[in-house]
């Protein structure tokens, strides 16, 4: 049932929905509904993962025109593998990276299947879990997927006109350094023109005049 997972946040949502006379239902893979000019299709979970709320995360893809956005919750390798084994089409323009960039999510095989133009990691700065992990970031980097992180860039907005997606952000943490600085002293290097964040070890860093550095 919709109230079988007991957390305060979830209970508050169910309570508020009840107060508003809204019926809360559990979607199934294949369910589609319209949201303005967009459509939302639920792709997973494709298996019952019992009491594991992470692997049992809802997976949904929002389509608008020729663009799409994949939301993966906190799913891990097991749920990813099951979706791929079930031949679920997970391709998307933008991937919201699972589980804040956990080491146990975003396998290379899954990332290849999604083949996103952009990846967004929603994660708090200096969190206790060490997210996003170097393992997840390395897998994204190996496939040359541009990554945008809320802990480095603040609020991130992905806008679609139905044909292309534009990524913008608002941050107070990024500081522009003089060209004499080098990536050796930093963990991440941003491109002020393309708005892409690279690992400092990436072989495709922007020119010095287009760099912004993050520790």
Report residues per predicted region:
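Mature, structured domains enriched in cysteine- and short glycine motifs
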Residues: 176-215
């Amino acid at each position: 049932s919709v109230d079988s997972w007991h957390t305060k946040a979830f209970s508050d949502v169910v309570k508020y929905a009840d107060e508003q006379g809204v019926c809360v239902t559990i979607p199934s893979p294949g369910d589609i509904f319209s949201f303005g000019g967009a459509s939302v299709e639920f792709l997973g979970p494709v298996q019952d993962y019992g009491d594991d709320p992470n692997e049992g995360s809802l997976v949904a893809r929002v389509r608008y025109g020729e663009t799409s956005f994949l939301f993966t919750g906190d799913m891990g390798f097991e749920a990813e593998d099951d979706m791929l084994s079930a031949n679920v089409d997970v391709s998307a323009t933008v991937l919201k990276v699972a589980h804040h960039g956990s080491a146990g999510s975003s396998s290379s095989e899954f990332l290849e299947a999604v083949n996103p133009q952009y990846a967004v990691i929603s994660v708090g700065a200096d969190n206790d879990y060490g997210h996003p992990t170097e393992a997840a970031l390395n897998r994204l980097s190996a496939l040359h997927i541009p990554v945008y992180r809320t802990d480095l860039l603040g609020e991130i907005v992905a806008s679609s006109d139905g044909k292309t997606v534009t990524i913008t952000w608002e941050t107070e943490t990024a500081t522009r350094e003089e060209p004499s600085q080098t990536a050796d002293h930093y963990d991440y290097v941003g491109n002020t023109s393309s708005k892409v964040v690279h690992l400092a070890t990436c072989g495709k860093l922007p020119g010095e005049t287009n760099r912004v550095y993050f520790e």
